[in-house]
């Protein structure tokens, strides 16, 4: 058991060394206006617009900062979205974030989003204890909403929450493979964000799944066939390991 309730999570090693293969192209998707607000008092619309201008100035002109994501639930959220859209910037693109249910998806459709992030939790901790579902129920529910998004012309960006505590080969890769099938059928991208929700990801050579960052990324690209440009890494609380 890598993640016991009573002790610090363990790191497994299988001595598999993965050669570096940098992303091409390399880009950033910004989450300042979504989870960036969860650690501080919420931004005002004026502050959001100012930060959005700075993001455009910093990397939006070149597309290095490719997109920003926004909540869309409150009147303030929607006003901020309208204000940033009115800037007319090509980058960062304004994208949404929702829970994986049809009511939220309807909000995204009504607000004419062409891409939206969906919370698709993948660890057993989240599936069984937070959602109260089985793996099969969770996957079926996720796929149903993703299919509906594609029907409505919305590119889904599936946020694999808590991926570094998940069963990569038993759940994540089969789920990702189904997403790639849907993408082929719809002739539309289905993007995946790998979310290290608890900060358990490690960059160490020889580290094993599910904690090896390079192992997770390579599994999605090589085993599930996810194109690199559809794949994002979303690190939380990396405790300076990004410097390793």
Language model features with spans:
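N-terminal amphipathic alpha-helix/helix-capping segment at the start of soluble metabolic enzymes
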Residues: 1-34, 38
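Metallocofactor- and cofactor-centric catalytic cores in central/energy metabolism, strongly enriched
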Residues: 38, 67-71
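A short, small-residue-rich loop immediately preceding and capping a beta-strand
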Residues: 69, 229-235
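Thiamine diphosphate
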Residues: 237-244
């Amino acid at each position: 058991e890598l993640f016991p309730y009573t002790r610090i999570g363990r790191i497994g090693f299988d001595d598999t060394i993965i050669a570096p293969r940098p992303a091409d192209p390399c880009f950033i998707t910004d989450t300042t206006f979504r989870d960036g607000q969860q650690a501080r008092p919420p931004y005002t619309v004026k502050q959001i617009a100012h930060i959005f201008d700075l993001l455009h100035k910093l990397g939006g002109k070149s597309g290095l900062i490719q997109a920003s994501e926004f909540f869309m639930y409150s009147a303030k959220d929607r006003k901020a979205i309208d204000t940033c859209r009115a800037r007319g910037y090509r980058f960062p693109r304004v994208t949404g974030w929702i829970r994986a249910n049809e009511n939220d998806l309807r909000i995204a459709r009504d607000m004419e989003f062409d891409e939206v992030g969906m919370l698709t939790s993948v660890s057993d901790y989240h599936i069984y204890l937070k959602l109260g579902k089985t793996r099969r129920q969770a996957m079926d529910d996720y796929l149903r909403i993703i299919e509906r998004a594609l029907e409505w012309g919305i590119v889904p960006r599936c946020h694999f929450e808590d991926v570094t505590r998940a069963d990569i080969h038993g759940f994540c890769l089969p789920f990702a493979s189904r997403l790639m099938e849907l993408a082929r059928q719809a002739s539309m991208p289905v993007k995946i964000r790998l979310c290290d929700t608890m900060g358990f990801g490690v960059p160490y050579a020889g580290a094993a799944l599910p904690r090896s960052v390079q192992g997770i990324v390579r599994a999605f690209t090589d085993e599930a066939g996810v194109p690199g440009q559809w794949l994002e890494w979303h690190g939380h609380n990396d405790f300076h390991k990004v410097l390793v």
